Amino acid sequence: MKAIILSAGQGRRLMPLTEVTPKCCLRPWGDVSILEWQISQLAVSGIDEVVVVTGFGHDAVEEIVNGITDIRVRTLYNPFYHLSDNLGTCWVARHEMEGPFVLINGDTLFEAAVLQHLLKDAGHYPIPLASDQKISYDDD
């Protein structure tokens, strides 16, 4: 199964952290970027191919992708990233959306168990969706 990760945007709400670094390349755990975490969890879940749709900071994303060897990963460039949102990024990746696939935002953190649970029941539903809701909200 294929996973498509939408990582074309800059993540302006996280400025100044994302001024020159794409959001998916941030390393909140020190050594591991968000993108590396996502791909590792996808691999553990049985995903065998990952397409990362890039835009802002393409070279930084490409550098991370080139260092991954335990799963097939490639990039697809969205030249319209500065003019569009995730819908535009999906349009750029539309030819990748054949057969079963998982679509993930480039800043979505998840554990493999969540994806495995979703995939386990995927055959029963045409478009399974995993979502989470906070029990309470703070002032942000």
Task: Name each region found by the language model.
Residues 111-140:
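Conserved core of the sugar-phosphate nucleotidyltransferase
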Residues 20, 45, 68-70, 98, ...:
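Short, well-ordered coil/turn elements that cap or connect secondary structure elements
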Residues 1-54, 58-61:
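N-terminal glycine-rich phosphate-binding loop and ensuing alpha1 helix
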Residues 60-63, 67-101:
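Short phosphate-binding loop-to-helix
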Residues 10, 107-108, 133:
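Active-site metal-binding loops of divalent metal-dependent hydrolases
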Residues 5, 52, 103, 128-129:
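Structural beta-sheet core signal
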Residues 99-109:
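Short beta-strand-to-loop acidic/aromatic patch adjacent to the donor-nucleotide binding site
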Residues 2, 48-50, 72, 100, ...:
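Residues at the starts of beta-strands that form the adenosine-phosphate
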